[in-house]
């Protein structure tokens, strides 16, 4: 019961944010179109700043001190490759392919991860989780942009796709973060404070906007795709990944990090990117909402079993 409450306490705030969005739309305080337009603020401003901040303050040297992070990076790449191979097999609509690929391989590790890690390990023992997120952010960002650009509605050349990947707002933020980190640049307070404040807005604002634009009828319409992605995202991918790390001899904090990186619900940025890149944002928003709800169950099951066998 304690583990169920722990998982619920992590996910519940995200669900409350979405409920606020639903109420804002239902009461007519904010129009659905305004909420869709407001996603551009997240896509072009707050989300890139959140990525920048995560990388700018990360201990990059520590990334290479343990083989765990190397295996984690390989796991992310393999998951993306398998998702890119699998999704086109059952989905023929380019407008949905990029969204489904992101749904399978990209987890909500930055928003969901630190909260879960702090609850399981304690506030003072989440160093590895922070470093893992700083490594996963650029990896997830690169492959997410590639997937979305690859299946964008218009026909474009490889060079055009590559240029869009390089100049994507999230990627530019990652470059800036690495630049500031490697050169040990300390921004003046007058710049750092607004960056921190805007980055902190990302999570609540993103989920409020998601709640205001999600269509509950879309759950029924996209039932097959949602079921497939939910099973893969919350159960199959983390089961395989965590099992692999256990076989490699990892225990404790490393297993918690692996569970979060590979088992968190669909990343909120999937919806934001779908809106910004003219993909199926209705499907993307529904995937984020449904997997966020069912992650309460999946995280409870994984945490319970791992604790029973003293793996964490």
Give residue ranges: language-model regions:
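Alpha-helical transmembrane segments of multi-pass small-molecule/ion transporters
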Residues: 1-312
